[in-house]
């Protein structure tokens, strides 16, 4: 009875964290993808968008993909719980790791591109862009924070997936017949 309650609370915690990661990644993608600013520079109107910096565009696509992945995993968690075999547990672990690495790498790459936009690169004669597109840069900074929070949450989820994988092996290594892995249906 206590083990079943633990599993249900673990599934609820995983579902809550997956929902939070999906919301953070979706918010990062939307904030980044929808932010634009038009300014007049030397009598020429210029529009700053996310497509101007390729690292930001890649971050928007990666964050949107991560949000979709977390929604699919949330549905899996709601309908299957912790049920499923070792193959499903390994697949979830590998996909969680890939999502965590991709989200973290694209967020850090976009942050590096934003540092150039913030400070400029004097050796390359690149001017500071955030002096011109202030609101756009603030929105990008907000999306970077949201993307990093989503990456950290995904890393925590990959640790939970690893625990789920090794729990399958722990149950099968004992000599008495172990009960099958718990599912949400056990409550």
Curated annotation (Swiss-Prot):
Signal peptide: none annotated. Disulfide bonds: none annotated. Keywords: Cell membrane, Membrane, Transmembrane, Transmembrane helix. Residues 1-14, 76-97, 161-187 are cytoplasmic. It comes from the Eukaryota. This is CASP-like protein 2C1. It is found in: Cell membrane. The keyword Repressor does not apply. PANTHER family: CASP-LIKE PROTEIN 2C1-RELATED (PTHR33573:SF30), CASP-LIKE PROTEIN 4A4 (PTHR33573). InterPro entries: CASP/CASPL, CASP_dom. The lineage of its organism: Eukaryota, Viridiplantae, Streptophyta, Embryophyta, Tracheophyta. It is a multi-pass membrane protein. Its main location: membrane. It holds the Pfam family CASP_dom. GO terms for cellular component: plasma membrane. The chain crosses the membrane at residues 15-35, 55-75, 98-118, 140-160. Residues 36-54, 119-139 are extracellular. Homodimer and heterodimers. Belongs to the Casparian strip membrane proteins (CASP) family.
